A protein has these predicted regions:
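Bacterial N-terminal signal peptides that target proteins for export
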Residues: 2-16
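C-terminal segment of classical bacterial N-terminal signal peptides
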Residues: 17-28
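Boundary of Sec targeting at the N-terminus
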Residues: 29-31, 38
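Flexible coil segments in periplasmic/lumen-exposed cytochrome c-class electron-transfer proteins
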Residues: 31-32, 43, 51-70, 102-183, ...
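Acidic/histidine-rich, surface-exposed loop or edge segments in extracytoplasmic proteins
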Residues: 70-78, 219-225
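Aromatic- and charge-enriched surface segment that lines or borders ligand/interaction sites
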Residues: 84-100, 104, 126, 233-236
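C-terminal structural cap/anchor segments
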Residues: 304-343, 347, 355-358
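Active-site/pore-lining binding-face segments in mid-to-C-terminal subdomains
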Residues: 345-372
Length: 406
């Protein structure tokens, strides 16, 4: 009986907040709920996926490519006809927690409800209350552009059976409070594993390789485990937290590709305590325990790569790959260089990179280097100065990345 009364009171309180918020009037005590909801929406990076280039925030329409076709993100502004204006808090919670939309249909996991299911009801309600206050935008979005048969929603039943289990996060009493807060953010709202874990042929995360890195939108999302070479093992928790705030690890590396958007729209807005909690949790992730080859196979193009590096890169990054502190990042020991996939280094050489937090911008070399020359430089950098990555950049890979999206 007590539980029922509490639920009724909570529902009434939320209804009061959302009703007044939708009318532009806030009752006493509503502001903290809305501020918390805005903060949590930032933590979940909702705006990045639900905003098309040049479009209104949260109005949807962003193209999300998958191996099975593409989706367009839906409008989640409070517009009554094309957004979620007619959704109740229960409708919203069912979508976030169970992956079922207002019409009772299984949702596609381009919406990461397999991670958001861990978020508490109170936090989901706060996000809902906040979204009720954003500007309603009339924007009809035809979300489903998947190939047959994946375009048929009933096919999601098999995927859900294999890869989805609903359940709110439960703290581990044996772990410190910071670790538990970090786990809640990383495994829930932050949905870090969604991009940083490889997926199988059906689009399910390979749990045995969780957080070990994966290709996303043509970029390689780096290994987040405590691996000393390719992951975060050599980083302090403070360095990880600082990276989430600024997008730069001083004198080591900078964010690339989609991660730059994550920092810009999400992690830089988090509190120092939350960023540090996420860092503490990531530091505890075990590395890949499988045996690794101790010796990198010889690269027959190494001589060409060394010459090209000297002519095009050595002036800034120095002969020993150490860079210049605060001006040019080092390449020796750089986690981007050491990543399992060479794609990020290829893109940086080919397209350059904008100025970030003190580092001078890097020019693009794609206009003057052939695909073979870019591959030679990348392989040289990945196997020099103690770097022990595999020299697996090829001209064909460079060509594919040149033809792909930015």
């Amino acid at each position: 009986m007590t539980i029922c009364v509490l639920r009724t009171l909570r529902a009434a309180a939320l209804l009061s907040v959302t009703a007044f918020a939708g009318a532009g009037i806030l009752p006493a005590g509503a502001q903290p709920v809305l501020e918390r909801g805005e903060y949590l929406a930032r933590a979940g990076d909702c705006v990045s996926c639900h905003t098309a280039p040049g479009g209104a925030p949260f109005a949807g329409g962003l193209r999300l490519d998958t191996p099975f076709g593409y989706m367009l993100s839906p409008n989640i502004t409070p517009d009554a006809d094309t957004g979620i204006g007619r959704w109740s808090s229960d409708d919203f919670y069912r979508a976030v927690h169970f992956g079922v939309n207002k019409r009772g249909q299984d949702m596609y996991p381009t919406m990461p409800y397999d991670f958001y299911t861990r978020v508490t009801r109170a936090d989901v309600d706060a996000i809902y209350a906040y979204l009720r206050t954003v500007k309603p935008v009339r924007n009809t979005v035809d979300v489903n552009h998947l190939d047959f048969p994946f375009s048929l929603r009933p096919t999601m039943a098999a995927w859900r059976e294999l890869y989805f289990t609903a359940g709110t996060f439960r703290a581990d009493p044996a772990k410190p409070a910071a670790w538990n807060r970090g786990a809640y953010l990383v495994e829930g709202l932050g949905h870090c594993s969604d991009c940083h874990s490889p997926r199988n042929a059906l689009g399910g995360i390979e749990k045995s390789k969780a957080f070990q890195g994966a290709v996303i939108d043509g970029w390689f999302a780096l290994d987040l485990t405590s691996d000393m070479a390719t992951g975060l093992g050599a980083w302090t928790a403070a360095e990880i937290a600082g990276y989430l705030k600024t997008g730069v690890r001083r004198d080591k590396t900078t964010v690339l590709g989609p991660m730059a958007e994550v920092v810009r729209n999400s992690t830089r807005f988090l509190t120092d305590e939350d960023r540090l909690a996420m860092a503490e949790y990531l530091k505890a992730l075990p590395p890949d325990s499988r045996l690794k080859t101790g010796r990198v196979p010889p690269d027959p193009t190494r001589g060409r790569g060394a010459q090209l590096y000297t002519e095009n890169c050595g002036g800034c990054h120095q002969a020993q790959g150490r860079g210049i502190p605060g001006v040019f990042p080092p390449l020796a020991g750089n986690p981007v260089v050491l990543a399992a996939d060479p794609g990020n280094v290829i893109k940086v050489v080919d397209r350059g990179i904008a100025r970030r937090d003190g580092y001078v911008p890097m020019p693009a070399f794609g206009y003057q280097l052939t695909e073979q020359q870019v591959a030679d430089i990348v392989n040289y950098v990945r196997t020099s100065w103690g770097n022990d990555a595999v020299p697996d950049a090829t001209p064909s890979l460079v060509g594919r990345l040149r033809a792909g999206p930015n």
